[in-house]
Swiss-Prot record:
This is Polyamine-modulated factor 1-binding protein 1. The keyword Membrane does not apply. It is found in: Cell projection, Cilium, Flagellum. Residues 545-556, 571-582 have a biased composition (Basic and acidic residues). PANTHER family: POLYAMINE-MODULATED FACTOR 1-BINDING PROTEIN 1, POLYAMINE-MODULATED FACTOR 1-BINDING PROTEIN 1-RELATED. Keywords: Cell projection, Cilium, Coiled coil, Flagellum. It comes from the Eukaryota. The gene is Pmfbp1. It comes from Mus musculus. InterPro entries: PMF1-bd. Residues 89-121, 169-281, 312-377, 411-732, 758-968 form a coiled coil.
């Protein structure tokens, strides 16, 4: 609930912060708008000034035009007056221009400044907008979180309401039980008064123990402080702690302190519960002793009063006493039951508290880990800062180098500027000289104009006075003067042009000067920026140095504080020792008899308490022994299981080895068969090639025979043609003979000749038919041989592909064989490692058994010591009123020391046993994890084997299918029959004979299994 309230408060605070940021953003927006308005105004002003500049330029141009016009007029009439006006106007306009330029420069600077401000404000606005967006998203998330937390609060309130109801009911029951327990408390208060004295003595012991604990805590804190100091005092490490890391460290320290407080509270609770248990056990023992006494009294009473009573009144008294005793016994039994219930409850509470303590210890461990992580982070941060400082130093050096370079450049530019200034001075001097020459020429012009006026006047006078001849001479002189005037004007024009050129050069030099000034200003600005960067870096360095100095001062202060605290502690210890000495002296001055009695009583009580504690510790130790035995049994079972698994693994390894051997054998057989197949294929190839050669030879011979037959046919055709011509001639002769009436003998001869010719013709025709049939058969055989050749070529290509595939598969098989061998080798190595580990575990088990035996022997020794202590206690109880002079305080102190030593030994033994048990548990867990890992590997190997077997089956099926496919087309004839055989006979021969010398099934039969041979996709045995 408190956490939820705190989160709600933080959420509200974040909302307020978001509102403030919104206001800041609105203010910034308003500022931005005002800046934009200012910039607009500036732009307007710039535009206006630009317009005025343009107007001024137009005015200047007009003035220039006017000046030119005035010049022309001056050349004709009043040159000097207009020139003066022009100069005045020119100077005035130049002043105006300079003023306007200055204004323009100032405005441009303002514009640049405003634009920079705008850019900066725009960047800040963008940053604020991004921050606002982030914060809005964070606010939304927080709002959702708050809603969820409110729902959780409602649920918690409902649960709290239910809990309060249940607690109210429980309270009611508890109040009833309290009312019942009130009576018991009255009886217990009496016994409490007796134990108050004991409590006070135990309190004094507790105070002493608390002082010791504080001392130990101080030493621990000193050691903890010394550890980081020792780490920090290392010369190679320089610690620069950032404030965030220090805050985290402080938070972790706070958490640690809270956890320590919780631990101390839990320890106090445990102590209180133990005290309660001890009290209840003591009460139970007292009640049991009282019962035993009552039983003894009753037995003595029955023994003394065996005879029946004489009177009825005595009987009634006895019965009343008996009833009263029975009631007391019942009440005591009830008390005993209640105390037993109380003991059970206290045990339950003790278990809960121990669980809480364990949780707290876990939290402590986590916090310590966090502390360790924070220390590592601080070291990382320090390393980063060191790197940053080194980087900044390098940057500083670079900037200083740049600064020196820029200074050198500025010096060079200054020199250039000085040169330019000198040139400007020279140009100005030249200008002055030109202006002086112009003035001289103007004076000469004025003189010439005066002379012309005088000449005009003299001319008029001469016209009036002299004759025409004088006028002509004067006119010639006037023309000469006019020519000289024109030459002077031309010279003036040339001088004007020179002036304009010099002015342009002056303007160019002025512009170059301005550019140089601007560049110098830029360089100076860059230098200033670099100086500022250097200053910032130096300030950062100074800050870092200051921080480091502050940290060192804090360290020194902490060390001084630690030294002061240690000195105060030592003084306090001295004072304590002095006080203890004074106490001992004062106690010695007291009555020795009373002391001895008190000490004896106290020692008996302490011994009883210690005896009870020892019994409890022995019970705990016995329980722990039982647990250890159970763990040992589990270990043995696990060892048995691991041995069984080892055996199974060994069997599997042997099986794998056998399978590997089988695979090797199978691979060798497969290789041998493949070699045989290869040889068979090569033999088949040679036979096929020889068969092809023979068929080619036959084909060539048949082609030759066909050519011969064609030649014979051509000859026979020629002979037939000759015979036909002869027949025709004979028929004509017959006709002629008939016509000429030839004799019968000639006719008969002719008939015989014609019959012979016909016989020859029929024979030739028969031969032709035979030749045509032979050619047809030869053509058929040729086609068959060509088809067979194509088939053979296809088969050869297929065989070559198959050979390639077989070679590839062979390589793959060899690779897989190597892999399997490597796997077997690795598995052997793993087996060896496992066997070594098993041997180690067996040794550890034996050592654990030895440790257990040693612990059992220690337990027996402790039990014997306990028995001796009990005997001594019983002896002390039997002689409680022995004279005090016999027991000296030294003996009592020795007795106390022995008891303390025994207790310390028992506690140390219990701690050692706990540590050993934890170590054993960790080892067992590690062994279980390793066994699980091995089983996983075994399952993986089994899956791989199954997969390989499936692939082998697939391969086998594919090989058998391809055998069946490849078996049908392999039946063919070895050699061709002779040429005169018919095709039907040839086919019969092919079917009957088959291919001799070549096995009909080229692929070997693979009936056995291919174990461990993987099947690559695409590979086949066809």
């Amino acid at each position: 609930m408190l956490k939820l309230k705190g989160e709600l408060r933080t959420a509200k605070g974040l909302k307020n912060e978001a509102g403030e940021r919104d206001r800041d953003v609105s203010n910034l927006n308003s500022k931005l708008l005002s800046l934009q308005l200012d910039i607009k105004n500036l732009h307007d002003v710039c535009k206006r000034q630009g317009k005025t500049l343009q107007e001024n330029q137009l005015c200047v141009e007009e003035a220039m035009l006017k000046a030119n016009h005035n010049k022309k007029q001056a050349q004709t009439l009043v040159f000097t007056d207009n020139q003066m006006d022009f100069r005045v106007n020119k100077q005035y306009h130049l002043r105006q221009l300079q003023q306007l330029k200055k204004k323009l420069l100032t405005l441009q600077q303002e514009l640049e400044f405003r634009t920079q401000e705008l850019q900066a404000s725009y960047c800040s606005l963008l940053q604020y907008q991004s921050i606002l967006e982030k914060q809005t998203s964070d606010l939304l998330v927080l709002h959702r979180h708050c809603k969820l937390k409110e729902d959780e609060v409602i649920l918690y309130e409902e649960e709290m309401g239910n809990h309060s109801k249940s607690t109210g009911e429980k309270l009611h029951l508890a109040q009833e039980q309290l009312a019942l327990a009130g009576d018991k408390i009255l009886s217990l208060e009496r016994s409490l008064n007796l134990y108050r004295d004991k409590y006070q003595t135990s309190l004094s012991n507790i105070e002493l123990l608390e002082c010791q604990v504080k001392m130990l805590e101080g030493e621990l804190s000193g050691l903890i402080g010394q550890d980081p100091e020792n780490k920090g005092d290392h010369p190679k490490v320089r610690i620069y702690t950032s404030p965030c890391v220090i805050q985290e460290h402080q938070e972790t320290l706070k958490r640690l302190s809270e956890v320590w407080q919780k631990v101390s509270e839990q320890d106090d609770l445990i102590q209180e519960l133990r005290n309660k248990l001890a009290c209840s056990n003591s009460l139970v023992l007292e009640r049991e002793e009282a019962l035993i006494k009552l039983q003894a009294e009753f037995a003595s009473y029955t023994a003394t009063h065996r005879h029946p009573p004489t009177s009825s009144e005595d009987c009634e008294d006895i019965t009343k006493i008996l009833k009263h005793l029975q009631e007391q016994k019942d009440s005591q039994c009830l008390h005993v039951e209640e105390y037993q219930n109380l003991v059970k409850d206290l045990r339950m509470e003790l278990e809960a508290v121990s669980e809480q303590k364990k949780k707290i210890m876990k939290d402590m461990m986590k916090l310590e880990l966090d502390l360790h992580g924070l220390r590592e982070e601080t070291s990382c941060v320090i390393e980063k800062k060191d790197k940053e400082t080194v980087f900044l130093q390098y940057r500083l050096q670079d900037l200083q180098q740049q600064y020196t370079e820029s200074q050198k450049l500025s010096l060079k530019k200054d020199k250039l500027l000085q040169d330019k200034d000198e040139r400007l001075h020279e140009l100005e001097k030249n200008l002055m000289q030109v202006q002086n020459s112009l003035r001289e020429k103007e004076a000469e012009l004025e003189k010439l104009q005066c002379t012309t006026k005088e000449l005009d006047t003299s001319l008029q006078e001469a016209r009036q006075s002299t004759s025409k001849i004088d006028c002509e001479a004067l006119r010639a002189e006037i023309q000469k003067l006019k020519d000289s005037l024109e030459e002077a004007r031309e010279q003036l024009k040339v001088s004007d042009q020179n002036l304009t050129q010099s002015k342009e050069e002056a303007h160019l030099s002025a512009s170059s000067l301005e550019d140089a000034h601007r560049k110098i200003e830029n360089c100076l600005l860059q230098d200033k920026q670099k100086e500022e960067v250097i200053k910032d870096l130096q300030s950062q360095l100074h800050k870092l140095q200051k921080e480091s100095s502050k940290i060192e001062e804090e360290r020194k202060h902490n060390r001084q504080r630690l030294q002061e605290l240690s000195s105060e502690l030592s003084e306090g210890q001295r004072r304590l020792s002095n006080a203890e000495k004074e106490k001992s002296l004062l106690q010695k001055t007291l009555d020795e008899d009373e002391k001895k009695i008190d000490e004896l009583f106290h020692s008996t009580q302490v011994s009883e308490q210690k005896q009870r504690e020892l019994t409890n510790s022995i019970r705990k130790l016995e329980e722990e022994l039982l647990e250890i035995k159970g763990l040992l049994e589990e270990k043995r079972e696990q060892l048995k299981k691991s041995k069984e698994q080892e055996k199974a693994l060994e069997e599997e390894i042997e099986a794998l080895r056998q399978e590997a051997k089988r695979k090797e054998k199978m691979a060798k057989e497969h290789l041998r068969k493949l070699d045989e197949e290869k040889e068979n294929l090569q033999a088949e190839l040679t036979s096929r090639s020889s068969h092809l050669d023979s068929s080619l030879n036959k084909y060539n011979s048949s082609q030759k025979v066909i050519q011969e037959l064609n030649a014979e046919i051509a000859r026979q055709k020629d002979s037939i043609m000759i015979l036909q011509t002869q027949l025709d001639s004979a028929i004509q002769k017959e006709k002629n003979c008939f016509q000429n009436m030839v004799s019968k003998e000639a006719y008969e001869e002719l008939v015989r000749k014609s019959g012979n010719c016909q016989d020859d013709l029929t024979q030739a025709l028969e031969k032709l038919t035979q030749a045509t049939s032979e050619t047809k058969s030869l053509n058929r055989s040729l086609q068959q041989t060509q088809e067979r050749k194509a088939q053979l070529e296809d088969e050869i290509a297929a065989y070559e592909e198959r050979m390639k595939k077989l070679n590839m598969e062979l390589k793959k098989l060899q690779g897989f064989q190597q892999q399997s061998e490597q796997e077997v080798h690795n598995f052997d190595k793993k087996l060896e490692e496992m066997s070594n580990q098993v041997l180690q575990w067996q040794r550890q088990h034996q050592s654990d058994l030895k440790m257990l035996a040693a612990k059992e022997s220690q337990l027996r020794e402790f039990q014997e010591e306990m028995a001796t202590l009990r005997e001594s206690l019983l002896a002390d109880e039997k002689e409680p009123y022995s004279p005090p002079a016999k027991l000296t305080p030294k003996e009592t102190c020795r007795h106390h020391r022995e008891n303390d030593q025994i207790m310390n030994n028992v506690e140390q033994w219990a701690k050692e046993q706990k540590i050993a048990n934890e170590k054993l548990g960790n080892k067992l867990r590690e062994q279980v994890k390793y066994i699980a890992k091995l089983t996983g590997e075994k399952d993986h190997l089994h899956n791989v084997m199954v997969h390989l077997q499936q692939e082998n089956k697939k391969l086998k099926n594919e090989i058998e299918e391809k055998k069946l496919k490849a078996g049908n087309p392999r039946i063919c004839v070895k050699a061709f029959p002779p040429n005169k055989l018919e095709p039907s006979q040839k086919g019969k021969l092919c079917c009957a004979l088959g291919w001799r010398g070549i096995p009909q099934d080229l692929t070997p039969k693979t009936d056995h299994k291919y174990m461990g041979l993987p099947h690559s996709s695409g590979s086949s045995y066809c």
